[in-house]
From Swiss-Prot:
It catalyses: Endonucleolytic cleavage of DNA to give specific double-stranded fragments with terminal 5'-phosphates; a 2'-deoxyadenosine in DNA + S-adenosyl-L-methionine = an N(6)-methyl-2'-deoxyadenosine in DNA + S-adenosyl-L-homocysteine + H(+). DNA restriction requires S-adenosyl-L-methionine and Mg(2+), and is inhibited by S-adenosyl-homocysteine. SAM may be a cofactor for DNA restriction. Keywords: DNA-binding, Endonuclease, Hydrolase, Magnesium, Methyltransferase, Multifunctional enzyme, Nuclease, Restriction system, S-adenosyl-L-methionine, Transferase. This is Type II restriction enzyme and methyltransferase RM.BcgI. The lineage of its organism: Bacteria, Bacillati, Bacillota, Bacilli, Bacillales. The keyword Ubl conjugation does not apply. Gene3D superfamilies: Vaccinia Virus protein VP39. GO terms for molecular function: DNA binding; endonuclease activity; N-methyltransferase activity; site-specific DNA-methyltransferase (adenine-specific) activity. It comes from Heyndrickxia coagulans. It comes from the Bacteria. InterPro entries: DNA_Adenine_Mtase (IPR051537), DNA_methylase_A-5 (IPR003356), DNA_methylase_N6_adenine_CS (IPR002052), SAM-dependent_MTases_sf (IPR029063). GO terms for biological process: DNA restriction-modification system; methylation.
């Protein structure tokens, strides 16, 4: 019979060894801790020596781990919802025992006044990890984990700041800094430039490109009203010279972009010295962007700064603000998707609906991280990243984005990917596609060709045989309940292979009302009848919604992401509540919830959560034009 020493202990031991730290079992060689444990037994009398199952340091943080084989022995809370460390609970429950030892060490030592106490219960397939922060005055439940990766020496300080102190994650701090600049710039563009709508983003793009031109200087902007000498004309000419010397092909693309910037030359408000600023609004904007944004854009980060500027601008109304039209994909999702299909420095990557270029930026960042010399870096930037975008305003932003990051070259095409000649992309040898198809456009028979599945089907034809496509779409896309969706699902499986579908956190697009999933296909190979497809429930991804802030990491997001990737790679195991591998039919709902069967007795909380999930799903389907599926149910029963 499997016992704790050969199952749960081994699981925990592997987790700790993966951290690369020195650990001890059943005690500590640290003099202070050893002394404190002398009277810390979990027995009723507490007269014996306390023997924590695992104890180690990560950085300067003391970690204590207790484990149990049975998941129902993970933790016990009294009627007040408090972890009870009285006997027998400290003996019988993992969390209670770990907290018991932590409190003893805090009380009996001078050096250790904070401890992270962790309870782990279960085995290699079904386990739970509950960490708690223990101090002299506080017992704080921390976010649940899937491994101990988040408390590794490399991650522990960030985890402590986010999970214990309640600070924002590093990425969110960067995002808020940029969004604050964008919000201020929005106000300035409106107040000083009298600009609305898409013109704000166009002005920002033009200035950033002008700042790249070696012959341009802010000192040239003197507020002249002479023909040919206005600040707007100087900026426009700098952009023209820069683009004409950047080797952009086809050359017509230069003309398209310059057409967007023409108004800057003679706009009276932009080119007139403002008495409050003591310069023209254009010079003021250019000075701000050079000082606060330019270095960030060129810092080889996967952060789509221009995209976030655009998102901040369109937040304030107008047609651009349609929440289901243009949806900016969060940074942690673009980078995850690039990793899911293993994008590497030798790939040719396409986003056929590239928007502001966020996916291409993530792909570039990942590829540059693998490059070994300047030639490889130049090759990646100039020859291996492609995009298609139909909307001129987004095309201008995306092109600016890629030019600023790509040594002056951009392989973007302004066209409709649904009607684009696939053979052109086939000629480039595209073997990886990342995409977020336009949402919610197929409302009736006349517009069914605009569905997400239609975009995916067309994109798959642009890949070489064996190429990978990774798309983020509403979960309703995978259901296929109308005749158009059914037909497309059937057609896709005749020519391509479905590999993975990942159900995401419902708040991924917080405030938009879309329940998303990630889908991965292999192109050009008919789906084998008995192939087992991976269906994953990744709703618990370590991101939560904070009031007045939005979606942020809770400190466990990195570990949960690494665990997901390890499970999909076959390097780690998990239960069917996370992943189900099964053969499929085109008539199935391609979602984890369709194939997953939970034979456990649901708790009251589980019941309410399931009902809430169903209502959310119904809303999502209705928002995507599939509300008819819920009509007349009683008549059909």
């Amino acid at each position: 019979m499997v016992n704790e020493k050969t199952s749960t202990d081994q699981l925990v031991r592997r987790f700790i060894e993966d951290l690369g730290v020195t650990y001890e079992e059943q005690g500590s060689s640290n003099i202070q801790i050893k002394q404190a444990l002398r009277s810390a037994s979990k027995s009723k009398s507490q007269s014996g020596v306390g023997k924590p199952e695992f104890i180690f340091f990560s950085g300067n943080h003391l970690i204590i781990v207790e484990d149990k084989l049975a998941i129902d022995k993970l933790e016990y809370k009294n009627n007040d919802g408090i972890i009870d460390t009285e006997f027998p609970f400290r003996r019988d429950y993992a969390v209670n025992g770990a907290v018991h030892y932590a409190r003893h060490i805090i009380e009996k030592t001078n050096s250790y006044k904070e401890v992270i106490a962790i309870g782990i219960a279960g085995d290699g397939l079904h386990y739970q990890i509950h960490p708690y922060f223990v101090s002299e005055t506080e017992l704080k439940k921390l976010p649940e984990m899937k491994s101990l990766e988040d408390i590794s020496p490399e991650n522990i300080e960030e985890f402590y700041k986010v999970a214990v102190l309640g600070e924002l994650p590093k990425e969110e701090r960067e995002l808020r800094e940029v969004n604050k600049i964008a919000a201020d710039m929005h106000e300035d563009l409106r107040n000083y430039g009298q600009l609305e709508g898409e013109k704000k983003a166009t002005v920002v793009s033009a200035i950033l490109l002008a700042l790249e031109e070696p012959t341009f200087s802010l000192n040239q902007l003197i507020g002249s009203d002479r023909v040919g000498g206005t600040d707007g004309e100087i900026i426009f000419n700098a952009v023209r010279v820069y683009l004409e010397n950047a080797g952009i092909v086809p050359y017509a693309k230069v003309g398209e972009m310059l057409d967007q910037f023409i108004f800057i030359q003679r706009d009276v408000t932009l080119n007139t010295v403002n008495s409050n600023l003591e310069m023209t609004p254009l010079k003021y904007f250019a000075t701000t962007l050079e000082a606060e944004i330019m270095d960030k854009i060129k810092s080889n980060t996967d952060f789509d700064i221009l995209g976030n500027f655009y998102g901040e601008f369109v937040k304030y109304g107008g047609n651009d603000g349609n929440p289901l039209g243009i949806v900016l994909t969060p940074r942690h999702i673009t980078s995850l998707m690039a990793e899911l299909i293993g994008i590497n420095k030798s790939d040719f990557v396409l986003d056929p609906a590239c928007g502001t270029g966020a996916f291409l930026i993530s792909a570039m960042n990942r590829m540059l991280g693998q490059a070994e010399n300047d030639d490889e870096r130049r090759d990646i930037k100039q020859n291996r990243l492609y995009g298609i975008e139909i909307q001129q305003k987004l095309f201008t932003i995306a092109t600016t984005n890629m030019i600023l990051r790509g040594d002056g070259k951009s392989n973007l095409i302004r066209d409709n990917c649904l009607t684009f000649d696939n053979t052109i992309m086939n000629g480039y040898g595209i073997n990886k596609i990342l995409m977020n198809p336009p949402y919610s456009q197929a409302k009736n028979d006349q517009t069914q060709h605009l569905s997400e599945l239609s975009f995916i089907q067309q994109a798959l034809e642009m890949l070489v045989v064996g190429g990978k496509l990774c798309a983020i779409v509403p979960q309703s896309t995978m259901v296929g309940k109308n005749r158009h969706d059914k037909a497309r699902k059937k057609q896709i499986l005749k020519q391509h292979t479905l590999e993975t579908v990942i159900t995401l956190n419902k708040d991924t697009f917080h405030g938009v009302g879309v329940n998303p999933c990630i889908v991965i296909f292999k192109a050009g190979i008919k789906h084998p009848e008995n192939k087992r497809v991976s269906f994953v429930n990744f709703e618990d991804d370590g991101h939560v919604v904070r009031k007045h802030v939005g979606l942020v990491g809770d400190g466990t997001e990195k570990g949960k992401r690494e665990h997901l990737l390890a499970v999909l790679a076959g390097d780690e195991d998990d239960g069917t509540d996370l992943i189900v591998k099964t053969a499929i039919k085109d008539t199935d709902e391609w979602l984890h919830s369709f194939y997953y069967f939970n034979d456990g007795i649901p708790s009251e909380d589980d019941f309410y959560k399931t009902v809430a999930n169903y209502l959310t799903f119904q809303f999502d389907m209705t928002a995507n034009g599939k509300g008819y599926l819920f009509e007349g149910v009683e008549e059909n029963e």
